[in-house]
């Protein structure tokens, strides 16, 4: 499973990239707002750091305007992935952009039916929001399983990009569900390495090593 860091913060992305933990980046209007920067500037800078797909989201809901914004975003770099709302207009734009050879990410997916439509429209990625479903008392990981089954049944090539990840357990659930990608906030991505027994065991080894009085270097 690939990791796309969910951030528009250049320093956060650079730190994780230096650890070889980033296969791509996802952004959205909320993250752009949080960055305090112009969307075109920040997306361009991210694309200079990351070789994998960088999702940049349109701010339009009507087909013609979506296509205009997508054309502007697509010119930023070859690894741009146009992020679209999972609506009828978004599906129409997805089909048109896919015909142009552009990568697309249909976002705000909350049902298997929506994911089926995304695949039929030729989306590169579909983004089920598992955290927001959990907030509503619906099992988000179950949706991932449903989408995986449907895609495997019909040989769809659209990749499942698990989004709205709130916990390290969400990452595990995404992997167990067969998601192709997890869109993970930097704090969660770094937390994956943590386990209290690892810390405890390491401290024991360090204490014992100190008692040997030896040095390796």
Curated annotation (Swiss-Prot):
It comes from the Bacteria. It is an enzyme of class 2 (transferase). Coiled coil: none annotated. GO terms for molecular function: aldehyde-lyase activity; transaldolase activity. GO terms for biological process: carbohydrate metabolic process; pentose-phosphate shunt. Keywords: Cytoplasm, Pentose shunt, Schiff base, Transferase. It is found in: Cytoplasm. Belongs to the transaldolase family. Type 3B subfamily. This is Probable transaldolase. It comes from Bartonella quintana (strain Toulouse). The gene is tal.
């Amino acid at each position: 499973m690939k990791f796309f860091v969910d951030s528009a913060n250049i320093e956060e992305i650079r730190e994780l990239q230096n650890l070889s933990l980033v296969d791509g980046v996802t952004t959205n209007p909320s993250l752009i707002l949080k960055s305090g920067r112009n969307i075109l500037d920040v997306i361009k800078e991210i694309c200079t750091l990351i070789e994998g797909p960088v999702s940049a989201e349109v701010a339009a809901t009507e087909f013609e305007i979506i296509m205009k914004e997508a054309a502007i975003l697509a010119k930023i770099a070859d690894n741009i992935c146009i992020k679209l709302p999972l609506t009828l207009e978004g599906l129409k734009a997805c089909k048109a952009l896919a015909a142009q050879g552009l990568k697309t990410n249909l976002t705000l997916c909350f049902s298997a039916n929506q994911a089926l439509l995304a695949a039929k429209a030729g989306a590169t990625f579909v983004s089920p929001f598992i955290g927001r479903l959990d907030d509503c008392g619906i099992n988000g990981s179950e949706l991932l399983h449903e989408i995986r089954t449907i895609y495997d049944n019909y040989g769809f090539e659209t990749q499942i990009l698990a989004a709205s990840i709130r916990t390290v357990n969400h990452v595990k659930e995404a992997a167990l569900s067969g998601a192709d990608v997890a869109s993970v906030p930097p704090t969660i991505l770094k937390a994956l390495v943590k386990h209290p027994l690892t810390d405890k065991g390491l401290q024991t080894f360090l204490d014992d090593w100190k008692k040997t009085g030896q040095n390796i270097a």
